[in-house]
Swiss-Prot record:
Keywords attached to this entry: ATP-binding, cAMP, Cell membrane, Cytoplasm, Disease variant, Kinase, Lipoprotein, Membrane, Myristate, Nucleotide-binding, Nucleus, Phosphoprotein, Serine/threonine-protein kinase, Transferase
Residue numbers carrying Phosphothreonine: 198
Pfam families per UniProt: Pkinase (PF00069)
UniProt key word Membrane: yes
Record field: catalytic activity: L-seryl-[protein] + ATP = O-phospho-L-seryl-[protein] + ADP + H(+); L-threonyl-[protein] + ATP = O-phospho-L-threonyl-[protein] + ADP + H(+)
Alphabetized PROSITE patterns for the sequence: AGC_KINASE_CTER, PROTEIN_KINASE_ATP, PROTEIN_KINASE_DOM, PROTEIN_KINASE_ST
Modified residues (Phosphoserine): 11, 140, 322, 339
Record protein name field: cAMP-dependent protein kinase catalytic subunit beta
Family note: Belongs to the protein kinase superfamily. AGC Ser/Thr protein kinase family. cAMP subfamily.
Amino acid sequence: MGNAATAKKGSEVESVKEFLAKAKEDFLKKWENPTQNNAGLEDFERKKTLGTGSFGRVMLVKHKATEQYYAMKILDKQKVVKLKQIEHTLNEKRILQAVNFPFLVRLEYAFKDNSNLYMVMEYVPGGEMFSHLRRIGRFSEPHARFYAAQIVLTFEYLHSLDLIYRDLKPENLLIDHQGYIQVTDFGFAKRVKGRTWTLCGTPEYLAPEIILSKGYNKAVDWWALGVLIYEMAAGYPPFFADQPIQIYEKIVSGKVRFPSHFSSDLKDLLRNLLQVDLTKRFGNLKNGVSDIKTHKWFATTDWIAIYQRKVEAPFIPKFRGSGDTSNFDDYEEEDIRVSITEKCAKEFGEF
């Protein structure tokens, strides 16, 4: 690398540092003074269920005054309490209202009533990466790399704010109208300076240190990135079995097999991300994220252009209009019931 290139690299690293310092300032302001109750259920017209979960659902809604479409996450307070997810739910809202990055879904409104908590986010009509990946089978390496680069930048941003994401998987990555990623579902995200111990995540994506009940840190996100890149490029995850316990055995074994079509650069990157030994895992070494960004598999990636969304996406989802739901599955519809008495007031006071 010539002197000019070295100088350019140096100035890029400096400008990233400046950017992240400013981002942290912005984040902390909102983290310390979270927005509360800036809308109500009556402001929205409910259109269709986009997804369901163990303690709530996500619906397409239309803001009556602005006619904008949004995705509204509705959480049943009593179910959240029953499933011991109070802390996770409060984390999700507090984090989402404070972050700001091109590849993170934006929280526009949050409010609660006697029965439910509501988070209203921008609606991403392209649907989940999961459904496109299953339909196409697998992504070419350049296609996978385009998405992977956005996750690398997003994790660099989140980790600089002391946030661990902990739930990377194709179901939580939405494809927007320009073919870029929007990371959604911050239900397991957490602000942690040192280590944390909670067992959470999706079996196929869990890092070995989580399975082994060790204290863990941000490095679990880099492991999950390895799993995601593998799954995007192969069409199936690196560790899979019928029962979670069998998956866990494979994960902690430290053995990964690669399809013959994987390039040698891809295999090398994955061996360094799917590294059981934390002292050797990329993203967790003294150079931090730059071991990943400067890896040969990313040699063609223009990180600044990706951040600026100037790179042409390999795939643009098809949809008709901003309220189209054809990229989402159908679910049984259910009325939103609101109690006449307030439930769990104490638990969700800060929401």
